[in-house]
Amino acid sequence: MFRCSRRKLAGVLCSAAAAATLASPPASAATTVNGGDAMYTVSPGPGREPYYCSAGFAILVKDVRYLLTAGHCTEHGLDWKDIGRNVDSHFPVTDYGRVEDPSGSGHSQVDLYDGSTQRILRAGTPQVGQLVCKSGMTTKKTCGKVLGLNQTVNFGDGKQVVGTIATDIPVGDGDSGGPLFYAGVGYGVLSGGNNQVSFFQPLPQVLAAYGATLA
């Protein structure tokens, strides 16, 4: 995850590291994957465990259903168990990717980890100071405030992600790709962070790049 020691974000370049995690797969997977649910790849090889990330928003591109997640989650090219085929990765500079979701159905929803879900009706851009929430497989649903917009983050090895939404929501390994939202509005997908600050790829930019709509 990110290693960002500065809380004052205006004009600050924060250092970062990738945010996928390795773990044993859960016993089963739901037919429809909601935002914030765990995603794990098919086995990358003998003796190696799958990669984990979190699902973002369900989208439609020319009537084909996909799940958004972080681009650094899909850059390995492995398909996702019980979900679908890995489609693409946009990382670095931006940080988003798609996974085919042929068995999914219904509207784009976020797992609130209390037995309920939140339907996402539209994409938007938050205001600095606004209350927002995120959902992820590791830290579940957590909320905080927007600290800044259009933030640049350094992953190391010359890799940067630009234009991110910064929040004070704590995140953990495996949360990458999870949705940033509030009520019925989706704002972004998690690129990374730590227990003090987190950064999200803005959702409107991703939808425009794909020519997509929310499912």
Residue ranges and their predicted role:
Residues 30-116, 120-121, 135, 154-155, ...:
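Catalytic histidine site
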Residues 125-158, 171-172:
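Flexible, gly/ser-rich surface segments that form the specificity/activation loops bordering the active-site cleft
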Residues 4-6, 16, 75, 135, ...:
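Residue-level detector of bioactive/disordered segments in secreted/extracellular proteins
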Residues 25, 79-83, 114-115, 126-130, ...:
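Short amphipathic alpha-helical surface micro-motifs
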Residues 1-29:
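Secretory targeting and sorting signals
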